């Protein structure tokens, strides 16, 4: 059997996303709006398969073929007859549920490959003897031949997502390395093109020069587009001795489906902001224009407090090894009014709370742009995983001048809260009951502060294309050096493009630190309804949760390459290091032996020292993070952040040794089953599924009732068209592939 790092266990937690009550409260028009936006999101989410690994689209197509012909219970009878044990068949169901849940065969949280936990020969017998194989023998055999080896392979390079020799990525062709990514970013910056909706393909030309294709995601390919700002950029360039060609049409047939449903949703929009937003999204996905997506995002920001909230596009850059290309995601959710009222009170206090942050006023935005902050119950979240909170859009220029929205996903948090006492690793016994009682409320506080005042705070110092600065060069002083500002962002540079590989994690660390820092403020806790000893317990559990998460984070570190695979977990490890460095017994991590005789560890947080030792340490660290971010000082920023993120076996903690203990006792993240919406006449029905691997599989089998086989064919054709770029990793699909 495979190393447990690379399998999903049979007893993995599976939870259903509960949004029945929120959906019931929608009007018929709101339901139709939500339905078409959900359809757009689910179709677009299929692009993530093409953004993850060369084999992911084939695995998805194969699984979908199998379970459309026989549901999990029917296939079980066949599998047992073929000689599988109940455990082996359950392992296959869990694997399939994992592929659907992550939109690929790499975990969305940690970027680690997972493989089926049963012998390959047995799975082959099930697949080739299945009803799907009887109905379409050539197609099913062909799919299996294309992805079977890669489905199980744990060759070192294939174990993680990464660039070049570090791992697998389909954002770049297989022969690209970090130098190519940097060169491409310089090229994109020179043309004022965003990387968010691009992929990079490299070939060696006849004269030995490298040829790079920058391919934009769009419905249109070579067709001329009238009045598009992109048309003039779709051409060949010579740049630093290399040939670049800007093309478009990536994921075209998938985005065509997205556009069709966005157009349908427009008919049920609640106001002109929503109509204009959707029109710009249609333009963006049709043309491949990030500028159009920015315009849509501007209308989205202006659409305050809608009943049905949504966002869609190439958004988060966590999984691009370089950190600037966005993964497709789309969500649709309904407002939870009770929790939203608390967040609105937090927004009302935000200007006052921003003044509490440990940097000078010049490092804060000139004007606080009052954002929306709502608690939402998710109906649909398509992509590779579901976060607990979001602060979007990610476009720096919009965030600085137009503002943003904060979203806390209430029914996702409810799934995360559900913690069994026996699963609480690395904690003192006396902390466990307190933790179970206060984890939910403390997480609400942390998510609120993290999104609104973490991601929502701070200013970037920018010199625009005309040479004008957005800060006073004469009077603004760097509090770390006592000197005038020496560095800033030039026109075309963004946080992601400048800080690239550390940008996501550094920013998550800043936001998490703001949450820890401001949760000490009594005014914040009163907003959420906590005073006296309850408030102190919320603070303690919030800080304890963070330092424990810092230890759990070691699961997401790869010693062989010295790489972190998950931005949030790297951030939490960095915070643990900062608080350990503060000393005075504030935090200790002690190796122990568990009651089972195996290695264990205990995290201890001295609650009496949170304010006296923890707060000043966090204050110093936060100020440094913000100053280096504001000034775009990537050299010092990288040195600071990578210094704290280094994992060594230096005493007293011996983190590399502790990592083995963390892996020994790790808990897999839950899989989440989402409902479907179904249009029956002019009414939209909510279709729910049981919280099990089989339920998750059924939800996906019923997700594309009209065009499932067509979509699978589209996905495999798109994957096959680009298979040559990963020839050393993937065998090209045989002809006749469906």
UniProtKB/Swiss-Prot annotation:
Cofactors named for this entry: Zn(2+)
NADP listed as a keyword: no
Family, per entry: Belongs to the peptidase M49 family.
Keywords: Acetylation, Aminopeptidase, Cytoplasm, Hydrolase, Metal-binding, Metalloprotease, Protease, Zinc
Result, substituting residue 176 to A: 25% to 35% of wild-type activity
Activity vs pH: Optimum pH is 9.0.
Protein's recorded name: Dipeptidyl peptidase 3
Reactions that this protein is recorded to catalyse: Release of an N-terminal dipeptide from a peptide comprising four or more residues, with broad specificity. Also acts on dipeptidyl 2-naphthylamides
Outcome, altering residue 451 to A/D: Loss of activity
GO terms of biological process kind: protein catabolic process; proteolysis
Catalytic residues as annotated in Swiss-Prot or TrEMBL: 451
Principal location listed in the UniProt entry: cytoplasm
Documented activity regulation: Inhibited by spinorphin, an opioid peptide derived from hemoglobin.
Pfam families: Peptidase_M49 (PF03571)
The protein's Enzyme Commission number: 3.4.14.4
Modified residues (N-acetylalanine): 2
